Each structure stands twice: as C-alpha cells, then as structure tokens.
C-alpha cells in the first residue's frame, strides 16, 4: 500500500493515510505523528509546544518541519518522516489542567526565537493572552513560572504588572528574582512599559 501511495510511512511501524490536495499529498496532523510520545498507558508524558503551537496561539503563521514536545526528562531529537521532533525539558508536572499554561510559558521562554514575528509583536500578543486568562489561571501561571528560569519570571512579571493583576502575584514573582541581576530580552519599552521595573534591558 505504501508503494501504491495509499498510505505514507512516518517511521518504522508507523504510517498514516494521506489525502491528495492541489499542493500534493497532505501532511499528517502533528498530534498523530507524535501521539506515542505524548501518552503512555493512558498517562500523559509530554505535550506539544513551541513551533507546534505558535499557530494556535496566533504567534506565528509559519509552518515548521520541527515538532517540539515538552517532557520531564531529557531526550535526544529524533526524525520521523519529514519531521524533526525536538524535546524541551519541562520542570513542572505535565497534566491536562496545566498544558495550556505551560505552552504560554514556553512561548515567553522562547520569545526571541518565534519565527516570522518580532519580539515586540510576540510581546503584544502575549499581553493579550495573559489578559484573557481568568484570575485563577493567572495565579496558576505564576505558580508554574516559578520553576522556569529567572528571565521568564521577569518577563511574566512585567507583562502581568502592565495588564494590572493583583499585587500579590507581582510580589511573588519579584521575590523569586535575584537582587541585582538584569535580563537581556529584546522587547522595547514602547510595547512593555514596565520592563525597567523588572530589570529587563
């Protein structure tokens, strides 16, 4: 069937049924390509993030051949069909209730590397995403961010302060940062007016 073009091979023992389009054979959905890397025995072990979800977050329109997966333990990148699958170590536990927030935090983490968009444009979109989170989700996002690196917490703090969240959340993030460390993040003060308060340069 593979030789007849009815199904396409992804990797050893993994195939998908391709549809013909005007541009050629369709790609399989990202989730189908990596399903076995996201769940094992009914338990979540990873989640799509980075390049894989920038489109759904309206952070980029670019389609990438790299699929990124958040996992709790380091794994080497692998190749599967036309896709490269890269793994990002996630220090928080992975469960259905926090995947959405982990994806947002990963976008903050890689703000300077999001394709086909400037850091300022990405920051404007992140401001909107943070603003649309419920107060409860904002609290959970802050809690999850505490396991990320300092500059992610600083950028989250600046964004949250700009959108006017409760002081308790701002204080929690400020206390988690080292006294005089500065963070080089390429976002302008015109877009993020609170950046200097968080020692972002």
Spans of model-derived segments:
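Short alpha-helix boundary/capping elements
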Residues: 6, 61, 131-134
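Short gly/ser-rich loop at a beta-strand->alpha-helix junction or flexible surface loop bordering the NTP-binding
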Residues: 10-14, 41-77
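Hydrophobic alpha-helical interaction segments
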Residues: 94-201
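Hydrophobic/aromatic-lined pockets within catalytic cores
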Residues: 2, 6, 58, 109
């Amino acid at each position: 069937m593979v030789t007849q073009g009815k199904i396409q091979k992804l990797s050893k023992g993994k195939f998908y049924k391709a549809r013909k389009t005007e541009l050629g054979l369709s790609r399989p959905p990202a989730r189908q390509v990596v399903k076995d890397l996201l769940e094992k025995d009914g338990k979540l072990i990873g989640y799509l993030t980075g390049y894989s979800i920038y489109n759904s977050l309206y952070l980029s329109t670019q389609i990438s051949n790299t699929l990124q997966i958040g996992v709790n333990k380091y794994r080497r990148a692998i190749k599967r069909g036309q896709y490269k699958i890269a793994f990002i170590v996630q220090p928080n536990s992975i469960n259905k209730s926090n995947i959405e927030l982990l994806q947002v935090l990963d976008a903050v983490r890689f703000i300077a590397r999001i394709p086909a968009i400037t850091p300022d444009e990405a920051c404007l979109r992140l401001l909107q995403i943070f603003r649309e989170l419920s107060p409860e989700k904002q609290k959970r996002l802050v809690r999850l961010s505490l396991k990320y690196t300092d500059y992610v917490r600083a950028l989250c703090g600046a964004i949250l302060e700009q959108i006017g969240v409760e002081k308790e959340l701002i204080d929690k993030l400020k206390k988690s940062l080292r006294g005089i460390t500065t963070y080089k993040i390429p976002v302008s003060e015109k877009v993020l007016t609170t950046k200097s308060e968080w020692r972002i340069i």
